[in-house]
Amino acid sequence: KDENRSLVAFKAGNRTVTSLLIKGRYPDVKEHLPSEEIPAYAVVNTQDLIDSVRRVSLVLESDAPVKCQFEEGKLVLEAFDNEVAQASESLPIELTGAGKVISLRPRYVIDGLAGVHSEFTRISFMDKGNPNKPSPVLISSQAAKDDKDSDNYRYVLQPHLLLGQ
């Protein structure tokens, strides 16, 4: 037994969920959630995106990121593993605003998409105004390609710096 570890448990009905408490201060999530609609975003089929992220991430070691290139009409996912293995897939998207190239960890993308209970997902590109640091992206549900968010689900992801690719 480790005396330095603390657990928290939540019980609802006949289910109990336990979690390890992490020391430190939890970041203020509200500062990362915009109060108004984000003008630049892509709409993609949720299941197609999950499947593609899973496939291209098969060539990656551990928790390496996937390069995501959002262009007019398509999203290109690319994964590289030390120049030995690589994978690439393209998905149709509806893009509003300028294209974007970001790098995301597949595990976190799939975790975020697991909460989307609609046919389509909106990936919004926030702009924090710092060109030296990638701005967060917001994943939310969307009932149809041309519809607004269908529920209140929002998931914030922080991209990684793109180095050498």
Model-derived features: positions:
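Specificity-determining recognition surfaces
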Residues: 28-31
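DNA polymerase processivity clamps
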Residues: 1-22, 35-165
